[in-house]
């Protein structure tokens, strides 16, 4: 083994080269129990692990980075549920009774218009007699809310029963600036 680790005769000026060659030649002569058929060309880099081992290394590295980012994250960005609820549009709106909202017709069955206004439940309103053909799927309408959830407690029941609908009165179509300008152009012609 001492023969394998012997440094080559190098001039005194290249001390770094001596140390480098000594460490390179000693690397293969350690505790490995090979047949001595190691290649003399030890300048090749070690092969990277492949397959599952490399995937596991990458996954572990990503987990470490994510953990570091989580620990460094400022608590200002994290909002509590109570804070989110307090600042939600539904809570800011206050009591729903007699509020005017905008909804969109998403389903029609005969003369029943199913309107989504962004609440917990949709509402069902009758199609008006006047200009009923204007109320098509996708049309935006104005509503006056009466109740966000129709519930009732039946005789002898201990819990409320809901029909999964809100109660609202259909006020009419939502008029946009574009529709007003189109009507004015028609009247002027």
From Swiss-Prot:
Report the locations given in the UniProt record: Mitochondrion
| Annotated positions of the N6-acetyllysine modification | 134
Q: Which InterPro entries match?
A: Ribosomal_bS1m
Q: Where is the transit peptide?
A: 1-72
- Which pairs of Cys residues are joined through disulfide bonds in the record? none
Q: Which residues carry this modification: Phosphoserine?
A: 74
List compositional bias (Low complexity) regions by residue number.
Answer: 30-44
Please, one GO biological process term?
mitochondrial translation
- List keywords of the entry alphabetically: Acetylation, Mitochondrion, Phosphoprotein, Ribonucleoprotein, Ribosomal protein, Transit peptide
Q: Name one Pfam family in it.
A: MRP-S35
Outline the segment boundaries, as ranges, of region: Disordered.
30-53
Gene Ontology cellular-component annotations: mitochondrial inner membrane; mitochondrial small ribosomal subunit
| Self-association and partners | Component of the mitochondrial ribosome small subunit (28S) which comprises a 12S rRNA and about 30 distinct proteins.
Q: Which PANTHER family match?
A: MITOCHONDRIAL 28S RIBOSOMAL PROTEIN S28, SMALL RIBOSOMAL SUBUNIT PROTEIN BS1M
Which family is this sequence assigned to? Belongs to the bacterial ribosomal protein bS1 family.
User: What is the name attached to this protein's record?
Assistant: Small ribosomal subunit protein bS1m
Q: Which organism is it from?
A: Bos taurus (Bovine)
* Encoding gene per record: MRPS28
């Amino acid at each position: 083994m001492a023969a394998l680790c012997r440094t080559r005769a190098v001039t005194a000026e290249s001390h770094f080269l001596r140390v480098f060659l000594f460490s390179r030649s000693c690397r293969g002569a350690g505790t490995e129990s090979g047949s001595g058929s190691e290649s003399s060309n030890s300048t090749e880099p070690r092969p990277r692990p492949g397959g599952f081992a490399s995937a596991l290394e990458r996954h572990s590295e990503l987990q470490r980075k994510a953990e570091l980012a989580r620990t460094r994250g400022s608590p200002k960005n994290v909002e509590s549920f109570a804070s989110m609820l307090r600042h939600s549009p539904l809570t800011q709106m206050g009591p729903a009774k007699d509020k005017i909202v905008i909804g969109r017709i998403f389903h029609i069955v005969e003369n029943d218009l199913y309107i989504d206004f962004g609440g917990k439940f949709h509402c069902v309103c009758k199609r008006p007699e006047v200009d009923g053909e204007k109320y098509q799927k996708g049309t935006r309408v104005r509503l006056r809310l009466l109740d966000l959830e129709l519930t009732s407690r039946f005789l002898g029941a201990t819990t409320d029963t809901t029909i999964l609908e809100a109660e609202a009165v259909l006020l009419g179509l939502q008029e946009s600036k574009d529709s007003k300008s189109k009507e004015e152009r028609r009247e002027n012609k």
